[in-house]
Amino acid sequence: MPFITIPDMHGCVYNVVTEKYLSIAGIASQSKKTLPPNSVCVSCIGTAGLVTLVSEKSQSNQQINAITPKEGISPYYVYLLMKTLSKIINKLGQSGSTIVNLNKKQFSKIQVIIPSRSILCNFDILCNPLFEMILSNQRENIRLVN
């Protein structure tokens, strides 16, 4: 199973390839931490404000906060919303030390506007084919490189 770390989050929309993978024993030891596809990963320590979507069941390290959208909430909306907030996330984590650190409590206090379900549904209908194409293109690029 892919194990997402901050280096895996640079320059991509989806985490298609990761540097590290978990063994069966590793997966079993943290089974409640498995992220479903289209969860949104946000880096909050070190290089704070990186945002990616999970392409397949994965787990991540503690430097990453993951958002699994509820039924009826577009993961693409959440992804794009977090992308627009990435500079704010980075600033909130700056405390005078050299390492940016936005803890889960601070992260959960970020206020956002969530449109109505009908707007989110229409947004999802428009964005879904685009994000499917992005994922397909990322996978194709990896196949071509290998």
What name fits each language-model region?
Residues 72-73, 77-80, 84-91, 95-100, ...:
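Amphipathic alpha-helical coiled-coil/heptad-repeat segments
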Residues 62-64:
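Glycine- and aromatic-enriched periplasmic loops at the membrane-periplasm interface
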Residues 13, 28-44, 50-51, 71-80, ...:
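Polybasic, glycine- and aromatic-enriched phosphate-binding surface used to engage nucleic acids
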Residues 7-10, 45, 86:
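Short, small-residue-rich loop/turn micro-motifs
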Residues 47, 53, 117-121:
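Long mid-to-C-terminal scaffolding/interaction modules that assemble large complexes
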Residues 1-2, 114:
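Extended boundary segments
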